[in-house]
Amino acid sequence: MEALKAEEFLAGLISCREAFWEKMNAERKSYGAEKPLTPAIVLRRLQFGVVMERKAAEVTARWVGDIPDLDLQQPMSEYVVNELKHTSILRKRIGELNGDPDALWNQPLRELKELWDYHASLGSLCELIASVQFGHEEFFPRTSKSFIERVQSIDPQTASVYRDTLLADEAGHEWIAPEILRRYATDAETQKKCLEALKIGCELFGKAIQSFNQSLPA
């Protein structure tokens, strides 16, 4: 099997990712992802964000030193810093709401732990990027916009945290993941592993999202 050209390879990853998004999006309402927000649900959503942001930083940080090109190593290190900054911002907001910033971090849902344990087990930078930054992280802006619209009326400060900081920062580093894959996923075996990592990562993410929504207070 020959390696695909970069744009053909990326198109295949995108097709797989978007097919999963369509499936997951169609199922979200059935397990309560769009239920009316309450202060308790908002707090739980913030605690979920703490786990997602901090874990993304942790699993990515170990690979930054292996990126051979400085023009990608530097922005990837800045990505890690941003994810930790977001973690701190979310923890601060949870504290302002008199919640426990580490509730879900210290007692993670089984499906959420399985998701990040999988990412931590991946054997290359490209597999991780395909699964996380090019994979399910692409869903974050989409679900966050819905959350912002619904939370604005009951908690405008939390809406501002997501809109003005988290989403704004996400937009600034969206280019990094595809460029890493273009540059380093150039052989057939790596491309195959990347596709598999994306598929598994999206499936595990879907299970984690479903479990999280089903665990929300009534």
Question: Model features per residue range: what roles?
Answer:
Residues M1-A218:
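Non-heme di-metal
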